[in-house]
Amino acid sequence: YADKVAAAFPHRLARSSDAPEAAGLYRRILAAQPDASVTVVSVGFLNNLRDLLDSTADAASPLKGEELVKRKVRQWVCMGGKFPDGRFDDGNGEYNVMYDTSGSVRAIHDWPTPVVFTGFEIGARIKTGAGLRSLPEANPVRLAYLHYTGLEPRESWDQTAALFAVRGAGEFWTLSEPGLCLMHQRVPHGYNDWIPHAKGNHRYLVARMPANDLARIIEDLMIAPPRPRHP
């Protein structure tokens, strides 16, 4: 669906290869921000964040990747993993952390700021998307759902990460006890475990609000019209 959405709307890239390299783009953005001001949200594989941690000094900043993250980032919100038990019945882990497991291990184990995980179980219970039928056909979110689900409701994994990043736990969720998300680099697919630890830098979301109530809040945000552009 991503290619179809990209083809339907104007943009400046003639080819995907014209897009800036992710780690370098992260470095330029982070270097321009005040210290301890940035919330990073990930809703996919963690190879780009691994590459950011592995990056070296450049024109954007004299700091190495881990140093730059530690200085500029306040927290990382990661849609990934499954908590507290990271394995499904087949022994595999959650999609975003299990494939590029080396990237997941490096990013999760070595990230130098607090991390909040919104796990598989959080978004799986929240079904959204039906309201997109009311939007104009030229709406990019509607078009993405049209090609991916036929405008049928689906789980809201990524939306929960975005909502927490902007509004916090609020009345939606509670935070787990501090701990460590431990990644296992198993062949062919990795998985995570949760280890409670009083000095741990990781937490995960725990459901609080009824799923149907939270689905209405998220869907209202999904179908809200964009703010008018100022000249």
Residue map of PLM features:
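Short intrinsically disordered, low-complexity coil segments enriched in acidic
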Residues: 1-4, 157
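Active-site histidine-anchored catalytic micro-motif
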Residues: 3-123
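Conformational coupling and interaction surfaces
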Residues: 94-231
